[in-house]
Regions:
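Non-catalytic cap/lid and distal C-terminal segments of serine-dependent acyl enzymes
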Residues: 20-274
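Positively charged n-region of N-terminal signal peptides that target proteins for export
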Residues: 1-4
Length: 274
């Protein structure tokens, strides 16, 4: 009798606790760049083959890697469990800025993330294969990427965000190897206008995308984020803007990602009801 009770309790514990989020490290081939690209995929503990799940594409910053988020902010696995969403973290190269480079045909990261990667993930995993089931955000270079890719691919993403994002590249012509990707500013001034988030705002219409922007007041990107917020207000584009004391570091991003994931969870839940 005692043995039966013990087994019953163990089974109850197994069912109640379940398994935590799982982390897959995969390689996705990019035809446009003719290479394999490492990507982390986090599946929530509720993941199974019977249901479909929303996906957050979470981008790393300059000099980062596909595993930066899961190593430096490991609690995102718990957030994936809490909200029942998948998280996909692709390798964006150390300095791609998630552009299709106009001066280097070997860099096609906009196409990779917004087309090739998403198509691959939708084939291999039980995703919600529509813009209502996709969001994208990131930190620093990845914050630029999150907004830039979503603004330009609104048929793919339904929500987007940025944490400490480089949302206007023009004040920083000599930084982060951007000149290697879009040409030096004096020789290619049009590229610096065309490849910045600030000049994609004409693509937006009210209530098409859910948008969240977050930047610390001690961050060197704070002023350009504040300016983006003001431009969105001027254009009557609804968005959430968060600023609080903080710098350009993982202490800030570990906190910011919690608010971003709650924001995207709310978006996914509202989309289910439509």
């Amino acid at each position: 009798m005692k043995r039966i009770v013990a087994v019953t309790l163990l089974l109850a514990l197994f069912v109640t606790v379940g398994f935590p989020a799982t982390v897959d490290t995969i390689s996705v081939f990019s035809k446009k760049m003719a290479k394999e690209i490492k990507t982390v995929v986090i599946k929530p503990q509720s993941y199974d083959r019977k249901n479909t799940f929303p996906v957050l594409y979470l981008l790393h910053g300059h000099s980062g890697r596909y595993d930066s988020w899961v190593k430096d902010a490991p609690h995102i696995k718990d957030l994936a469990d809490d909200y029942g969403m998948m998280i996909v973290c692709p390798d964006g190269g150390s300095d791609s800025w998630y552009w299709d480079s106009p001066v280097d045909s070997t860099f096609r990261y906009e196409t990779f993330v917004s087309r090739e990667l998403i198509a691959w993930i939708d084939r291999q995993y039980k995703t919600i294969p529509s813009r209502e089931g996709r969001a994208i955000t990131g930190l620093s270079m990845g914050g630029h990427g999150g907004l830039y890719l979503a603004f330009r691919n609104q048929d793919i993403f339904g929500a987007c965000g940025s944490m400490s994002g480089g949302v206007d590249i023009r004040p920083f012509p000599n930084n982060w190897n951007m000149a290697a990707r879009i040409g030096a500013q004096p020789e290619h001034p049009a590229n610096w206008e065309n490849y910045t988030v600030m000049n994609q705002l004409h693509l937006l219409t009210p209530n098409t995308l859910r948008i969240i922007i977050d930047c610390g007041t001690e961050d060197f990107f704070f002023q350009v984020n504040k300016r983006l917020h003001e431009e969105l207000l001027y254009r009557n584009i609804p968005h959430d803007f968060i600023s609080r004391p903080g710098a350009h570091n993982w202490v800030y991003w570990n906190n910011a990602v919690k608010y971003q994931m709650l924001f995207f969870h709310d978006f996914f839940e509202m989309a289910k009801k439509k």
